[in-house]
């Protein structure tokens, strides 16, 4: 059981300014090490993106090994589920390992650790068409081949037709899917 949860905000200063978007992402993640002062070496640390929500109801399945949360992956809202690949998101490990190996090691290797099945939710590209379009133009994959078709008009079509921004078809979320706890700020994303 988690006795105490500690949240700290870390500001990434002196961001890389080059053309490589991955260097910025990795730098920001590395800055998490600056927020560990006073955290015991045996504390559990979660390495996650902001749109990944671990299911704390499955925390009892943790052991003393680094563990990844396999997650339901929703696209645009809870209406659509992405099934193109399994999503292995949040990684949980001990603070000492986190400090020794660094956050990018765990994020880059999250598919290699033991995992808890369906232990959370990845809320990918939630928001209106303008917000999603802005994300697609600025995130680390923005310069990948084939991304030039991601105009605002196409993003609007992707959302209305249930098409992943890379072109694959999304499925309607099955009714039996376990959903995250309902928060009033998320009401517009429930169908």
Label each residue range with its predicted role:
Residues 1-6:
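Short, small-residue-biased leader/transition segments that mark boundaries at the very start
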């Amino acid at each position: 059981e988690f006795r105490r949860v500690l949240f700290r905000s870390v500001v990434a200063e002196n961001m890389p300014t080059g053309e490589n978007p991955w260097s910025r992402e990795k730098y920001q993640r590395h800055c998490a090490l600056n927020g560990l002062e006073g955290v015991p070496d045996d504390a559990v640390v979660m390495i996650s993106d902001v749109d990944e929500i671990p299911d704390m109801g499955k925390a009892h399945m943790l052991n003393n090994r680094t563990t990844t949360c396999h997650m339901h992956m929703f696209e645009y809202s809870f209406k659509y589920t992405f099934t193109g690949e399994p999503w292995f998101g949040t990684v949980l490990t001990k603070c000492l390992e986190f400090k020794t190996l660094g956050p990018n090691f765990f994020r880059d290797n999250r598919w290699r650790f033991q995992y808890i099945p369906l232990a959370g939710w990845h809320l990918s590209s939630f928001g209106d068409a303008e917000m999603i379009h802005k994300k697609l133009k600025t995130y680390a994959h923005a310069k990948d081949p084939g991304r030039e078709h991601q105009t605002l008009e196409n993003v609007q079509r992707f959302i209305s037709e249930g098409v992943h921004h890379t072109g694959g078809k999304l499925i309607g979320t099955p009714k039996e899917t376990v959903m995250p706890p309902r928060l009033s700020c998320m009401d517009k994303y429930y169908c």
